[in-house]
């Protein structure tokens, strides 16, 4: 089916990236709430669930939006900029934008109109936070959702 190969590559890259650091012992249910996800998106969501350590996900009730928030320990040389370089090698057309005001350094990137991800580096503790959306109606909506939610979650990282 169209997009399946691209999706498989994205999933493989995300899994490889997630496995690059061990999980952070932070209660993700205190990092982001269903109410905050609903406020940012303007949609109703099912309760969050944790598909793996260091990640919480929310699925829209009766809709396509899916939100993921992850916090992972970051190796000394790893950063959003090294992730940007890897992404550009794998998918040269990917547009990466710097986002100010979240963590020490943050980037937003998307490979399709309905997908968006914001990743931010934090130093104390040395972790990377990622907020992702799938099922957005437009590129602008995807960027708005992950940026607004990252601004809510970011100040709580490591607290």
Residue ranges and their predicted role:
Residues 26-27, 93-159:
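A short, solvent-exposed beta-edge/loop patch
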Residues 33-36, 79, 83, 142-149, ...:
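Stable alpha-helical elements in mature extracytoplasmic
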Residues 40, 44-115:
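Short, solvent-exposed recognition patches
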Residues 26-43:
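Short N-terminal segments immediately surrounding and downstream of signal-peptide cleavage
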Residues 12-13, 23:
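Cleavable N-terminal signal peptides
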Residues 19-25:
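Sec/Tat signal peptide C-region and signal peptidase I cleavage site
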Residues 1-7:
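N-terminal secretory signal peptides that target proteins for export/translocation
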